[in-house]
Amino acid sequence: MLSGYDNVDVAKIDGNHPHDSILQFFAIAKANINQYDNIFIDNLTHYQKLWLLKKGESTKSGMPEIKDYALLDNHLLKVVETFNALDANVIFTAWETTRHITHDDGQQYTQFIPDIRDKIVNHIMGIVHVVARLVTKADGTRGFMLEGDQSIYAKNHIDQRNGCLQRELLEVNHDEGSKK
């Protein structure tokens, strides 16, 4: 989607070697970080599936083993932490899923969240500064919800915006001269 724009470099994860590929991408990003204001990882949902598929290739059943899920959880947390340490805006995308929540009083609702493994989705959402939900209005305008409610998990720890147009997401902290 961004390929072909000025000042945009696109690297693709090697589906046959997703683990090594993300590590190589990090090494390149770190070595060249002074050339980038923003780094996008698109997307964590697909990456975790590729990672588990690769693990499954080495089993008799062709399916990942139980231990692989714990390894993936640790790996994803490290990926997010490691990329977040770079001196750039790091944006992780994920597909969306829902989870059903029942309160002690019996009230039930459905919450939209990033499609990341249940065991770590809360942790990952907790260690990033912004969790946003992309929405499209009837007129085609796309924007991000930056403040959540019980049905949408969203947060914005960078500024006071509750939402923004898609093109405005990274228009933050220009007055302070900071990338982040």
Regions found by a protein language model. Name each.
Residues T98-K180:
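Conserved GTP-binding G-domain of TRAFAC-class P-loop NTPases and closely related GTPase folds
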Residues Y5-N7, A85, M125-G126:
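Short, well-ordered coil/turn elements that cap or connect secondary structure elements
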Residues A11, I91, H129-A132:
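Hydrophobic/aromatic beta-strand patches that form the interior of the parallel beta-sheet core
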Residues M1-I41, T45-L50:
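Conserved P-loop
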Residues I28, Y47-L50, T82, I127, ...:
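Conserved, well-folded catalytic cores of nucleic-acid-processing
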Residues N38-H123:
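P-loop NTPase motor core
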